[in-house]
Amino acid sequence: MLWLDMGLGKTVITLTSLAHLLRTGFLRGVIIVAPIRVIRLVWRQEAVKWEQTKHLKFSMVTGTKDQRTRALLRPSDVYLINYENLGWLAETLQTYFVKKDRPLPFNGIIWDEISKMKNSSTNRVKAFRKIADKFDWTTGLTGTPASNGYKDLHGQFLVVDRGERLGTSKTAFRTRFYRKVGPYKEVPYEDTEDTIKKLIGDITLEMSAEDYNPLPDLMVNNIKIEMPDDLRAKYEKLEREFFLVLDSGKEVEAFNQAALTNKCLQFSNGAMYPVAGMPLWEPVHDLKLEALEDILDEAQGSPVLCAYAYRSDAQRIMDKFKHLDPINLTECKSEVSLTNAMHRWKTGDCALMIGHPASMGHGIDGLQKNGHILVWYGLNWSLDLYEQFNARVRRQGQGVPVICHRILMQDTLDQAQAMALDDKATTQAGLRNAVKQYRLTKGA
């Protein structure tokens, strides 16, 4: 398991390792499982940059079912597949190889952003376990191993060591390391942290960027916005009654606590979706747009990278600042459009670039070369997405401190999100440091 900070070269390190193992004959092939954008834009492109890996032959196991099958049967060194197709992969390998007693075309597997396998009860983890014993070499890559606490580790190590260190049962894992506090809450035992660190330390290599080449400072600036009294009254009514009538006459209703949380966050951002799952939204206020405008004015033309939470946020930002010809990187679906967008940013021809953190984290590099200002128009609950997005600018090659503006509505769930992210970061940093110390004491 490789826990390497963003920007430390996980891709080329892994490519070099697998090229060596292919050359020695230990591996006959490797399949890499990664987010779809990374599959399309990262691994092949990185391999051709280096003398020791440019010879590797890749097969893209994407597209329709027939296209994936043909790609899987095509002789290659490295096969690339996205997480969403893991179930299909397990079924197809069983049909074409396992049941016919044929060797798989690969005996090595790499999990790029293995944190996506953190939940051991998901179908993708269950599907892989059916073929897990067919692999002689497994590597997991991530920069955010425990963004939501130690429970995230069970599924990740299950697909790496088949349950040798943390067990095969999620229920048994929780019983062993957590105690119940009330009907729904669980907290770790006092020795949980130390025990887990010792169990996983022998196969976990941690490397922090700041240990080798210090990253620039991240200066977090929380911009807290006060709601006017009339807007505050509406927000409080929504939180209290799970119901609100908008100025347009449209009714907004939340049927459970999770839905209410989402509605409150939409309200804070300035637009709401009256009907869940429908694309139509209604404006509520422009307070965050005004705050973003102030940030852009202060930047005086320096490129600003802005994270949004909802499609309504993106549309309103693009409309408000259309005179800047902004780029929504999330909408750059092809390699050509992504390349053009990155070129505009790197040449100083883009004052505002926006994107959803889920599509902006993995596989986007180069933004640090011409920008140092981040804005969170709306936060999320995922530390992984939060740190990955920030790392687009705060990474190797950045020469100045990075400014991270977080636009927060005062006394709303915006602040709860900020506090939750800060708390999770403390837990993960402690885990990474402890694993590093464990390996040092072992002389690894």
Residue ranges of each PLM-predicted region?
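Conserved helicase ATPase motor motifs in RecA-like P-loop NTPase domains
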Residues: 6, 135-150
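Conserved Helicase C-terminal RecA-like lobe
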Residues: 6-9, 13-35, 214-239, 243, ...
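Conserved helicase motor
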Residues: 37, 59-68, 83-88, 118-122, ...
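Conserved helix-turn-beta segment of the N-terminal RecA-like "Helicase ATP-binding" lobe
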Residues: 38-63, 160-163
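Conserved helix/coil segment N-terminal to the catalytic DExD/H
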Residues: 65-78, 83-105
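Inter-lobe coupling linker of SF2 helicases/translocases
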Residues: 80-86, 98-99, 118, 122-136, ...
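SF2 helicase motor core recognition
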Residues: 87-90, 148-150, 313-318, 338-342, ...
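A conserved SF2-helicase RecA2
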Residues: 381-444
